[in-house]
Amino acid sequence: ADAFAQAEAFAQEWVAAWNARDLDRILAHYDDDIVFLSPNAAQVIGDGRVEGIAALRAYWGQALDMAPHLHFTLETWLAGHQAMTILYANHRGQRVAESVEFDSKGKVVRSMACHAP
């Protein structure tokens, strides 16, 4: 499949995994050595940089518990070289851009979330 088809499939599955609130399904997309940057992480765990799959599981597990009505609506996606950006709206109506970098096996090794005001 071409990069655009792969990016579209990833974006749709990623949003579906979040909307299912399935932490294992969400984390299956990420490499063990993931580095994740998010202003929300800074609020929830005191650090905007989350390193490693265990730390990411702990953070997102806590975040899911804090947001029982969490729901993402996919707006669009952009494909790049071993990278993509997912643009979505969260359950609070806030727009979020999640940019990810993939390794050669298609796992996310670096991700950053940027939020609209």
Residue ranges: model-predicted function:
Residues 1, 44, 57-117:
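A beta-strand edge to alpha-helix "cap/lid" segment located at domain peripheries
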Residues 27, 37-38, 72-73:
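Short, hydrophobic secondary-structure boundary micro-motifs
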Residues 1-28:
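Short, low-complexity N-terminal intrinsically disordered segments enriched in polar/charged residues
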Residues 8, 12, 54-61:
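Generic alpha-helical structural signal
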Residues 14, 26-27, 34, 52, ...:
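Hydrophobic pocket/interface hotspot
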Residues 12-16, 30-44:
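Short, solvent-exposed secondary-structure junction/capping segments
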